[in-house]
Amino acid sequence: MSSSPVPLLRPPVPGNRGNGPRPPKLTLGIPPSPNSRPVDGNGVGPAAAAPEAPQPQRPSTRPAPPQLRLATPMGSSSDVPQEVPRLANGRPAPPPLATTGLNESTGHSRSSSFTYLDGKASGPASASSSNYSALSFAMGLRQPHGSTPDPSSAISSVYSDREGGVQMERDNSVNGLLPDLDKLSLEKGRPLDVDDLDDEGWLAASEQKKIIELGSLGEGAGGAVTRCKLKDGKTVFALKIITTDPNPDVKKQIVRELNFNKDCASEHICRYYGAFMDKSTGTISIAMEFCEGGSLDSIYKEVKKLGGRTGEKVLGKIAEGVLNGLTYLHSRKIIHRDIKPSNILLCRNGQVKLCDFGVSGEFGTKGDANTFIGTSYYMAPERITGQSYTITSDVWSLGVTLLEVAQHRFPFPADGTEMQPRAGLIDLLTYIVRQPIPKLKDEPENRIRWSDNFKYFIECCLEKEPPRRATPWRMLEHPWMLDMKNKKVNMANFVRQVWGWQD
């Protein structure tokens, strides 16, 4: 018997909104989980007996917890021999650089305060290429020597073969000479810009010193993101350099699959201009659209620093943008796989865009526990336990993201208690799988009230049974979404208030 769909069309229940200042007194931090170890199944085997008089088995009366098995969502766990990468002269290639997680910059700190930031003029002017699941990583398992991560899950979950896809990337550093960009500029009669370069062109721009750095956007153990432009070009772009060390064949597949993303054309998807692999350093560089408003993660932390709270109407526009982006990606047969606050960007005009569909999640598991943990916090229960990963898993991650931004804290555990500092990741993942889902609650002490439809939207996103969880396009028909679509919100003014821009 098939499961009934989630009842999204429940009549909306109006909620009250309080007026006046709402100074939050919450602390942020993705806490570890309670200081307790997961309970293993403790079935007792048959009792020992003499051969002539065997005794019956005595099963344990203790119930076994849900099975938390190792996950291989998109890949294979079989070992595949790795070939030693070699240079053009036949000698073995030097090992790539070691890893180092990407922390976003959260500058522009000010001491002013806000009430609800809803776009109004109130307030001051202003990756996993691993074959293991989150649980196996938390238990200390590592990839066996000689095994190769499955390239099919290297960047985004492209779940159909694309005609000519293998031809999308030429091995530009071995099979041919790089283009002379000065000559190409003369032929075009104008300076080159981001749309003029393919992957060979981007590698040539790097080697011919045509990429001008304008400032750092963040750096850490996994790499760095820099604001750049091409020499004599007009477009400012973000260059993300990833220094982690997956298998070389996977790196090539990553560059190929980024070209799938390059063909995406949606106002809700951060545009990818190109990517290239530098074999001398073992890094992958990704040129992408620069979104000046920053990530939702940096925005809500800045709002918290200012003593405010992101308003429900702003959250509605953010949710609408994410759902539209996920719907578009699904039409391209792509699953994002890594929805979280740091992968939701806002432009200066307030446009919401998705970035990193798979990039940070895939690289995050390789030698950087903090990055991996940060990603796995937003995983749907089915992904934690190794079940198939679908587009509705991204809807779960959206629910966790909205709940975190609304409450200014990570929503697990649901009661908001502080967790023990030495509790392990496996405890938290087990908690997410086994315990009731968190709910959005009003905060009378801070005079903060959320609408009943918003609370119901979060509840629908955090449906634990995948068949009952709605798709992104179905969630766009939710009563809360229909209500939010009719709201007038100046998202550009909201971003301007957060960062204190005067123009």
UniProtKB/Swiss-Prot annotation:
Pfam families: Pkinase. ATP binds at L217, G218, E219, G220, A221, G222, G223, A224, V225, K240. InterPro entries: Kinase-like_dom_sf (IPR011009), MAP_kinase_kinase (IPR050915), Prot_kinase_dom (IPR000719), Protein_kinase_ATP_BS (IPR017441), Ser/Thr_kinase_AS (IPR008271). Coiled coil: none annotated. Disruption phenotype: Results in severe sensitivity against cell wall-disturbing compounds congo red or calcofluor white, and drastic alterations of the fungal morphology. Impairs phosphorylation of mpkA. Residues 100-115 have a biased composition (Polar residues). Belongs to the protein kinase superfamily. STE Ser/Thr protein kinase family. MAP kinase kinase subfamily. Mitogen-activated protein kinase kinase; part of the cell wall integrity (CWI) signaling pathway composed of pkcA, the bck1-mkk2-mpka MAPK cascade and the downstream rlmA transcription regulator. The CWI signaling pathway regulates cell wall integrity and pyomelanin formation. CWI also controls oxidative stress response, gliotoxin production, iron adaptation and asexual development. Finally, CWI is constitutively required for A.fumigatus to cope with the temperature increase found in the mammalian lung environment, during infection. The gene is mkk2. It comes from Aspergillus fumigatus (strain ATCC MYA-4609 / CBS 101355 / FGSC A1100 / Af293) (Neosartorya fumigata). Keywords: ATP-binding, Kinase, Nucleotide-binding, Transferase, Virulence. Residues 211-481 form the Protein kinase domain. Residues 1-130 are annotated as: Disordered. The keyword Transferase applies. GO terms for molecular function: ATP binding; MAP kinase kinase activity; protein serine kinase activity. Residues 121-130 have a biased composition (Low complexity). GO terms for cellular component: cytoplasm; division septum. This is Mitogen-activated protein kinase kinae mkk2. It catalyses: L-seryl-[protein] + ATP = O-phospho-L-seryl-[protein] + ADP + H(+); L-threonyl-[protein] + ATP = O-phospho-L-threonyl-[protein] + ADP + H(+).
